[in-house]
Amino acid sequence: MKAVIFVVDGLGDRPDKNGNTPLKEAKTPVMDRMAKEGICGLMNSVDIGVRPGSDTAHLALLGYDPYTTYTGRGPFEACGVGVTVKPGDIAFRCNFSSVDENFIVTDRRAGRIENTSELEKELDGLKIDDVEIIFKESGGYRAALVLRGPGLSDKITDADPKKEGKKVKEIHPLDDSKEAKKTAEIVNKLLKIAYEKLDKHPVNEERRKQNLPVANMIVPRGVGQVPEIMQFTEKTGLKGACIAGTGLIKGIAKMVGLDVIDVEGCDGTPDSDFMAKACAIVETLENYDFILVNVKGADEAGHDGNYELKKQVIEKVDEMLDYITKNISKDEVYFVLSGDHSTPIEEMDHSADPLPVVLWGKSVRVDDVEKFDEFSTYKGGLNWIKGVHIMPILLDLMGLAKKYGA
């Protein structure tokens, strides 16, 4: 037996005034069929009442307790773009953002700029005092930052104000150590250098001419050091792969030892080649026991407050599932369909609202759920579970779970 965990990033939502969500209103005949043929429930990827990051959520779905393994988003983001994060390195996730001359954020994602490779070159390889700056774009407005040098600490604050109209935050140490103080000073110096180098860069001058938001600032967050983490194959006995479009998910996969399968045209946006990813899933199952799949577009639509786009992305995902389920055997593959977190249209951010989940495959205890959405699956036989329960359930069904006790 093989297994797939298929994550529709940002899937869940809250009902609008008519009681609808993008998922409830979308035409999803395949998701609904899987709900009828599988066992359903609700899932909080991290815990009840906890707003998950995509990082902590995916760790949990892979069977890792995020409360003991998570050290910050930065190391995963850096790993995802090919940077080897060494012990002692300090890593961050960054956004390219638009700011005014007072560092007031006018667009947190720089108009969702598509290509920042030329801007990356302005910062990668810099040296501030005795610290090397490693800076890599991670797709669109996303980037990874690594500080490498002696005497650094991750005990510092983030720069992200999290809202437009607010000033980029000055970095402060979180303890009295000289290492934390030094690291905060280095990052603050870097932010000033970044603005000086990026604001008048030809890429941004051209964007101004086109009346587009400029990418004239980097905003670091999610600071952390490389975690100690058991490899997935050692933990589960499965040979695993990952198919995802974003650096963060690729980084998590690489760090736990999953092989990352790159698919041309799949960049994590609503315009990705969804069917290319579907084909890749079917092909990859021929050589692997397990695949983690992340489809990102619905999350971007949720962050932008775009109800119609989120619904359209979900319908594209349903078309993917149509192809996949027609080309795999239910008797050979267990398939988990859910999200990593809700990204409600009204919030335009992650929320703790639970997600619909269905487990589809042979010998599951089929319940009477007939539709896959936030309101129907709560009646299902899985009841209300956490993300860390998914892998143990799969391993048990696959005959790989170890007995607890005599």
Swiss-Prot record:
Keywords: Glycolysis, Isomerase
SUPFAM superfamilies the UniProt entry points to: Alkaline phosphatase-like (SSF53649)
EC class: isomerase
Assigned EC number: 5.4.2.12
The keyword Isomerase is assigned to this record: yes
InterPro entries: Alkaline_phosphatase_core_sf, ApgAM_prokaryotes, Metalloenzyme, Pglycerate_mutase_ApgM
Residues passing through the membrane, by range: none
Any single GO BP term: glycolytic process
Coiled-coil region(s): none
Pathway(s) of this molecule: Carbohydrate degradation; glycolysis; pyruvate from D-glyceraldehyde 3-phosphate: step 3/5
Record's catalysed reaction(s): (2R)-2-phosphoglycerate = (2R)-3-phosphoglycerate
Gene3D superfamilies per record: Alkaline Phosphatase, subunit A
Any one GO MF annotation of this record: metal ion binding
Free-text function comment from the UniProt entry: Catalyzes the interconversion of 2-phosphoglycerate and 3-phosphoglycerate.
Protein family (similarity comment): Belongs to the BPG-independent phosphoglycerate mutase family. A-PGAM subfamily.
Annotated protein name in UniProt: 2,3-bisphosphoglycerate-independent phosphoglycerate mutase
Organism (species): Methanococcus maripaludis (strain DSM 14266 / JCM 13030 / NBRC 101832 / S2 / LL)
